[in-house]
Curated annotation (Swiss-Prot):
Keywords: Cytoplasm, RNA-binding, Transferase, tRNA processing, tRNA-binding. Its EC number is 2.7.7.-. It is an enzyme of class 2 (transferase). It comes from Lodderomyces elongisporus (strain ATCC 11503 / CBS 2605 / JCM 1781 / NBRC 1676 / NRRL YB-4239). The keyword tRNA-binding applies. One of its GO terms (molecular function) is tRNA-uridine 2-sulfurtransferase activity. This is Cytoplasmic tRNA 2-thiolation protein 1. Pathway: tRNA modification; 5-methoxycarbonylmethyl-2-thiouridine-tRNA biosynthesis. GO terms for cellular component: cytosol; cytosolic tRNA wobble base thiouridylase complex; mitochondrion. GO terms for biological process: protein urmylation; tRNA thio-modification; tRNA wobble position uridine thiolation; tRNA wobble uridine modification. Plays a central role in 2-thiolation of mcm(5)S(2)U at tRNA wobble positions of tRNA(Lys), tRNA(Glu) and tRNA(Gln). Directly binds tRNAs and probably acts by catalyzing adenylation of tRNAs, an intermediate required for 2-thiolation. It is unclear whether it acts as a sulfurtransferase that transfers sulfur from thiocarboxylated URM1 onto the uridine of tRNAs at wobble position. Prior mcm(5) tRNA modification by the elongator complex is required for 2-thiolation. May also be involved in protein urmylation. InterPro entries: CTU1-like_ATP-bd, CTU1_C, Ncs6/Tuc1/Ctu1, Rossmann-like_a/b/a_fold, TilS/TtcA_N, tRNA_thiolation_TtcA_Ctu1. Belongs to the TtcA family. CTU1/NCS6/ATPBD3 subfamily. It is found in: Cytoplasm.
Length: 379
């Protein structure tokens, strides 16, 4: 459903601790300071601006001599994070003269009762913020909807498939618009949950990307950044509430089965005792990253005798092995890939096999369809 934020107001019977003139209406979740609406807006927007400036989020577009290269896409979903992001980016772009052309980029995954409704909110945001809007669908890009993916692969795999497909869809949308930078509404809660997920899975190597403010991929030329990296979800909800922003508040139909939900519940309990638990977790993840880089430098130093014999396309990995850097193209869709198939096409190939197998039981020519499907796939 589409609604304005209805966050319950916190009763605070004192003056704002910043301006000392207006009545405080909240205790800021991050540090429990009592603030009025105006001061909360100011500190929220200033902290986002500081994140942008300190991490040079738009250095690759702000300095461009060509206006068309100053475009930045906002990953829009109609939810609270992307709605607040669009509002704040518009405000900061005008206040600090970033000189950016902001564009809303929305992906329709094909989830009935969820995405079809949230798209209406995105269209409302387009009018309210006066930004161009581009919508791409899984069906048009992949000939699959997420509802079809779930019916074939099962609900427990939904986030795995959707994460890969959505990332590539955003890249394709940005390429279509001639944009090489996307901002997303990922916040401190999201980043902390990802750090914990990677720890629980024993995937230490992924922690580096999960704590980066700016990320890029060896398989894409599109750069991504997270202006809300240090802003909590609670504060984003408060901002939406006091700004009276309209957003789509229903959770994704398939998100309840995600393991991430267990991490979210744990953080929810911990934040009641330690409000800074999310940012603390992010900082801890960044320390892992620094340790990993130090180990890599040491390994490179230990292998200095071999270094002069290596071409520029070689890299010494932390375990001492040598990786060859190659720029490949997916044989199916043409996207940059480290293997013959990009991750999205590899997953889609598996789905096509499953769909063809299912047809064996329902149609007489199912076996022929399966054989034809297998012949068309490259692994």
């Amino acid at each position: 459903m589409v609604e304005s934020s209805n966050t319950k107001k916190v009763k605070v019977s004192s003056l704002c601790e910043l301006c000392h003139g207006r009545k405080a209406v909240m205790k800021r979740p991050k540090n429990l300071r009592k603030l009025c609406k105006e001061c909360f807006f100011h500190v929220f927007e200033t902290e986002v601006h500081n994140t942008i400036v300190e991490n040079k989020l738009f250095a690759n577009v702000e300095n461009s001599e060509f206006p068309e290269r100053r475009a930045v896409a906002i990953g829009a979903s109609g939810g609270k994070d992307s709605t607040v992001l669009a509002s704040v980016m518009k405000t900061l772009n005008e206040r600090y003269n970033y000189g950016l052309k902001l564009v809303l980029l929305c992906i329709d995954e094909g989830i009935k009762g969820y995405r079809d409704h949230s798209l209406e909110t995105v269209k409302m945001n387009q009018k309210e913020y006066d930004m161009p809007l581009e919508i791409l669908s899984y069906k048009d890009l992949y000939d699959w909807t997420m509802d079809e993916v779930v019916s074939c692969a099962g609900i427990r795999s939904s986030c795995t498939y959707c994460g890969v497909l959505r990332r590539q869809a955003l890249d394709k949308g940005a390429e279509k618009l001639g944009i090489n930078h996307i901002v997303t509404g990922h916040n401190a809660d999201d980043m902390a949950e990802t750090v914990l997920l990677n720890l629980l899975r024993g995937d230490i190597n992924r922690i580096e990307n999960s704590t980066k403010i700016i990320t890029d991929s060896e398989n894409s030329v599109i750069q991504r950044s997270k202006p809300f990296a240090y802003m909590s979800q609670k504060e984003i909800v408060l901002y939406a509430h006091y700004k009276n922003l309209t957003y789509f508040s229903t959770e994704c139909t398939y998100s309840e089965e995600a393991f991430r939900g267990e991490c979210r519940s744990l953080f929810h309990s911990l934040s009641a005792v330690l409000p800074s638990v999310h940012t603390n977790t992010i900082y801890s993840g960044q320390q892992f990253k620094r340790k990993a880089k130090a180990m890599k430098r040491q390994n490179n130093k230990n292998n200095k005798n071999n270094k002069n014999n290596m071409a520029d396309e070689h890299e010494v990995l932390p375990n001492g092995t040598v990786a060859i850097k190659e720029s490949k193209r997916c044989k199916k869709c043409g996207s940059l890939a480290s293997n013959d198939l990009c991750q999205a096409c590899f997953l889609l190939a598996g789905l096509e096999v499953s769909r063809a197998k299912v047809s064996i039981d329902s149609e007489g020519d199912g076996a022929a369809k399966l054989s034809k499907t297998l012949e068309g796939l490259t692994f």
